[in-house]
Amino acid sequence: MGLKINRPRRGSMGVYPRKRAADIVPRVRTWPDVNLGKPALLGFAAYKAGMLHAVVVDDRPTSPLYGKEVVKAVTVLDAPPLFVWGFRLYTLDPTNGYLRSAAEVWAGELPKHLSRVLTLPEKVDVDKQMKQVEEYRDVAVEVRALVATQPHLSGIGKKTPELLEIPIGGVPNIDERIKFAISLLGKTVSPKDVFSPGQLVDVIAVTKGKGWQGVVKRFGVTILPRWHKHRKGHRRTGTIGPQAPALMFTQPRPGQMGFHQRTEYNKRLLKIGENGAEITPKSGFPHYGVIKGPYILIQGSLPGARKRLVVLRHPARPPRRAPPTTEPQVVWVSSQQP
């Protein structure tokens, strides 16, 4: 019996196929059913500006550093308000159980930047659309707000907005959700209307693209010695598998790396600010610029490059031992250099 060699499989089939995301705007496949006691949007969208480090008072009672100042890496998100330009009612298809759009209502007055991504009608007949809502009110199972980002209020320097659908939840009664959606038509929603400091959020974004990469960078294959044991190359595998099957998923292969949609769960939201000048460094964020309005501080790193759209949502699977939901005390941020 020969020596048993431990050779774990390379990569995860959970993220197969490793190809470029279909859209740079992340697609949220799951929305949690949370009980907030009042109707509210279940998510928000912001732009990644950069990272800093902050001094925060540790408020976890079981931590050895409880009550002491600790240094945390934080990500800064530029969070201009979202514009609600409509909402949709969804019913269940009796044949397959899927959601089907039943009614749609647009706001009477739409911003001019929305014409860059939508063909705007000359006049919106809101009364006619509201009759459809009343027709499907009894069979509706979900209400989703149609929102548009406002990048002209951010530090990116572009005008074309991104469009998203964000469900309205927080209460089980569908009539309360519809009433809340009607009240939001033509208005803006700030991050404080959706989240509160101290809570956990899930982050969905498209990662930074790396292009076509080899097996060493993509899967961490060992580089062979440069002067022997490398008959046909030292930055490659010895074999890519047998003749049949044609493709071995356990074998590292070169290909696309990065620009994949990824979800990171249970990131703690440290702070929601209104004045971006208090968080922006003197020379601005590198490769981003200046934050002009509301911003969000999240503990840890987030996927994606600077200027990339990041979608935040209420946690889909919060931990059993969640940190305190009270607002953390942020003592100092590294952008406040003398």
From Swiss-Prot:
Stretch forming the signal peptide: none
GO molecular function, one term: structural constituent of ribosome
The keyword NADP is assigned to this record: no
Entry keywords, A to Z: Ribonucleoprotein, Ribosomal protein, RNA-binding, rRNA-binding
Pfam family, one: Ribosomal_L3
GO CC, alphabetical: cytosolic large ribosomal subunit
Keyword Cytoplasm: no
Coiled coil: none
Annotated spans, Disordered: 230-256, 315-338
NCBIfam families in alphabetical order: L3_arch, PRK04231.1
Family named by the database record: Belongs to the universal ribosomal protein uL3 family.
Subunit relationships: Part of the 50S ribosomal subunit. Forms a cluster with proteins L14 and L24e.
Protein function: One of the primary rRNA binding proteins, it binds directly near the 3'-end of the 23S rRNA, where it nucleates assembly of the 50S subunit.
Protein name: Large ribosomal subunit protein uL3
Source organism of this protein record: Pyrobaculum arsenaticum (strain DSM 13514 / JCM 11321 / PZ6)
Lineage: Archaea, Thermoproteota, Thermoprotei, Thermoproteales, Thermoproteaceae
Gene: rpl3
